[in-house]
Amino acid sequence: MVKPEKFIPKAVEKISKEIKDGRAIIALSGGVDSSVCAELAHRAIGGRLQPIYIDTGLMRKGETERIKHIFSHMNLDIVYAKDRFLAALKGITDPEEKRKAIGETFIRVFEEEARKLEADYLIQGTIYPDRIESEGGIKSHHNVGGLPSVMDFKKIVEPIEDLYKDEVREVAWALKLPDEICERMPFPGPGLAVRILGEVTEEKLEVAREANSIVEEELLDRFCPWQTFAAVIGKGTGVKGDIRAYGWIIAVRAVGSRDGMTAEALELPWDVLKKLESRITSEIPKVARVVYDITPKPPATIEFE
């Protein structure tokens, strides 16, 4: 287990040595990983750090506004790139190809922003499980295996690449980051794109966004899952108002875990599952069916893609 009082000064020193007197941008998502990196980097290089948040169009409901509010004290640069990411994903159905398309687009946007700022370094919040899954061929993370082979940066700096998620939270508490950040549930870097099986479309994104919002409203505060979400996994036949309906199938996932390397599905009460089904199918007319995924990790991964 990490000892924050020892880790923090070492990480700050490492960032200072790697960036020297250069300028850096940091990929800030608002999650605990990137937020910890931002605080460490700010302590290391101060005003030579520029945090950048990219609105990919693949975010949860209200995500960009939430980020603006939380980081209003910082000189946060927000880049709106929805059209660019959707164009990069058009026609792609394979999950690995989707992750790589997202990783490539992320890097190209960051390169463009870095050139404007004359920044030569990119700081990002890669953690140890990201590396394990990418290097082990389980799935490419957009910030590891999903990155292009040629990048216009002197170096990518990853201050917390050897930490597990629970260790990152310990460091976040020690850095006195806001509770909302320290306790924030993990959200994948590729966003809702990996909660949509097959090609990403505007319609699927809207369905996934609304379904995820409902699931979080119903489960987060009451059951405190390590992670919970909804995924669009295909289409199926249903009946609405005595009329045949061919609509989307939503899979709900809620798991408990310590570090994300293994996970168990939560045994949710039947009345809770019924309420989830009722809300999702009534509030999202294009949904015909709701299922609950009870598969642990392994053999499954937490996210569907």
UniProtKB/Swiss-Prot annotation:
Sites where the protein binds ATP: S29, G30, G31, V32, D33, S34, S35
Key words of the record: ATP-binding, GMP biosynthesis, Ligase, Nucleotide-binding, Purine biosynthesis
Positions of the GMPS ATP-PPase domain: 2-184
Enzyme Commission identifier(s): 6.3.5.2
SUPFAM superfamilies cross-referenced by the UniProt entry: Adenine nucleotide alpha hydrolases-like, GMP synthetase C-terminal dimerisation domain
Enzyme class, UniProt record, top EC level: ligase
UniProt-listed Pfam families: GMP_synt_C (PF00958)
Keyword Ribosomal protein: no
Gene3D superfamilies: 3.30.300.10, HUPs (3.40.50.620)
Keyword Cytoplasm tagged: no
GO CC annotations, alphabetized: cytosol
Reaction(s) catalysed (UniProt annotation): XMP + L-glutamine + ATP + H2O = GMP + L-glutamate + AMP + diphosphate + 2 H(+)
Superkingdom to which the source organism belongs: Archaea
Pathway(s) annotated for this protein in UniProt: Purine metabolism; GMP biosynthesis; GMP from XMP (L-Gln route): step 1/1
A GO term for molecular function: ATP binding
Subunit structure: Heterodimer composed of a glutamine amidotransferase subunit (A) and a GMP-binding subunit (B).
Known function: Catalyzes the synthesis of GMP from XMP.
PANTHER family in alphabetical order: GMP SYNTHASE [GLUTAMINE-HYDROLYZING], GMP SYNTHASE-RELATED
Protein name according to UniProt: GMP synthase [glutamine-hydrolyzing] subunit B
